[in-house]
């Protein structure tokens, strides 16, 4: 059990939240949602508490909350993950639930092309485990299998503020061998490994869709010294870059003056080597030369503007001198494993 604001456990390193509504996770079914709908449990922002806020059902709580049971049994909910993936662990968060949290929970998972039904076979990833009030509860999952859906059981009833499912998307390289894909997409396995500054956030730079507002992207603090800011993305797969998109949506008085990109083929470097990646990036080959940017616009750069045709595994986006970028897309094809 860990209080809000504490450091994430080791198993969460190099993962994304597969249960993020912002990435596309969906609430499919709940046995009861009297005090709070299941969708709230999948929200990306930390749970909030409003002491004086009530609705027609009683005290408004920022999470999924069921009514008090007066008989045998327990409540459960089914969630479609944002992407099929390998699950590293969970955060069952009872923030602000002090007298109405479940006594325990358990979690199961399945792999299904369709939404689960009564015939679906589930695998238990977390046995019945006790919960406490107003706290993050981190549990590691010990499985290398790929799953698409989660079933959270709460015993016997109560409220869960947030459920985080930390994992890595499972990319079917063979199925995508001849397709142009966004190699940087976090839903395919792309991930941010390092950045110079992320004062106003960075995680959503490689998220799906266009940014909803100025807080939905990567933005640095105002630079008061010489230099520029940068961010490094490990691609979902080693690939040939064909087209780049830099989107400054909603950044109007704080967009970068210009950008450039560098790239490298670093082979199969794992998350444990991320610190080494950052120190070597200044020497990487130029992929996109210095280009001017404009406010609240989509900037596309085709193959005729790119200077590096070899396969790459990592890219570094440089912004001059600072500012915000909503989305970065690196479109290309997965490289043949035999190519150099």
Curated annotation (Swiss-Prot):
One of its GO terms (molecular function) is allantoicase activity. GO terms for biological process: allantoin catabolic process; purine nucleobase metabolic process. It comes from the Bacteria. Its EC number is 3.5.3.4. Keywords: Hydrolase, Plasmid, Purine metabolism. It catalyses: allantoate + H2O = (S)-ureidoglycolate + urea. InterPro entries: Allantoicase (IPR005164), Allantoicase_dom (IPR015908), Galactose-bd-like_sf (IPR008979). Coiled coil: none annotated. HAMAP family: Allantoicase (MF_00813). This is Probable allantoicase. It comes from Rhizobium meliloti (strain 1021).
